[in-house]
Structure formats: structure tokens, C-alpha cells
Design a protein with these regions (language model features):
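Phosphate-binding glycine-rich loops and adjacent basic patches that engage nucleotide phosphates
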Residues: 4-11, 32-41
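Second-shell loop/turn segments in exported
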Residues: 14-18, 27-37, 61-64
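Conserved active-site and cofactor/substrate-binding residues in soluble primary-metabolism enzymes
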Residues: 24
Length: 109
């Protein structure tokens, strides 16, 4: 019987995002989040109201995903973002402009 090698387990992350179609809209939402007394609460509120992604109904919650499941540029931004860091920039993919909030990350094990 072969042992499962846990050292090859891919990275994973639990994130929320807001997906919008235009750069000025993304900038405006980031400003609202940054200036809020409770940035995460504001993020959730804005995700529900403005996100073009079906996850908007879940306040932007994408749940946990493993490396390789999302668009490359999106994942690159996730791995470069600190946990629970207020978003200060957005990332552009073929789907539009994403504002990302990272709740947790696990590195390769």
C-alpha cells in the first residue's frame, strides 16, 4: 500500500471578493472600504449590493479554494495579500475587476 505524501498538498485560501466591470467603480468601492469604521462589514455590504459575481448574495464569500482553481491573476493577488488586510488595490482578470479580502491561507504542506 502506498502512503499519501502530504508534502505535495496544494496551497488553499478562504476569500471574499467583489467583482465589478469598471476600474472607477473598483476604486470607489476600495475607498469606501478603507474609510469605513468596520472595513470587513463594509466589504460584505458592498459585495452584496454591487458584485457581479453570484457570490455577492453570500456577501462575496467564495469559500475555500485550492491553488489552480481560480484565474491565475486572481490567485497571484490572493497569495500576495496578507490575511484580513483591508484591500488597497484591485486585480483585473478576464472577468472584470476584483477587490479581494483574504480570511485564511494555508501554504504547501
Amino acid at each position: 500500500m502506498r502512503r499519501h505524501d502530504k508534502s505535495n498538498k496544494p496551497r488553499s485560501a478562504h476569500v471574499r471578493h467583489i467583482l465589478v466591470g469598471h476600474k472607477p467603480e473598483a476604486r470607489d468601492l476600495i475607498e469606501q472600504i478603507t474609510n469605513a469604521k468596520n472595513p470587513l462589514r463594509m466589504f460584505k455590504k458592498l459585495a452584496k449590493k454591487y458584485s457581479n459575481c453570484p457570490s455577492g448574495s453570500k456577501k462575496g464569500d467564495l469559500g475555500e479554494f485550492v491553488e489552480g482553481q481560480m484565474a491565475v491573476d486572481f490567485e497571484t493577488a490572493v497569495w500576495a495579500t496578507d490575511i484580513d488586510q483591508k484591500p488597497s488595490k484591485f486585480v483585473k482578470t478576464q472577468f472584470g475587476y476584483h477587490i479581494i479580502w483574504v480570511h485564511s491561507k494555508t501554504e504547501h504542506q
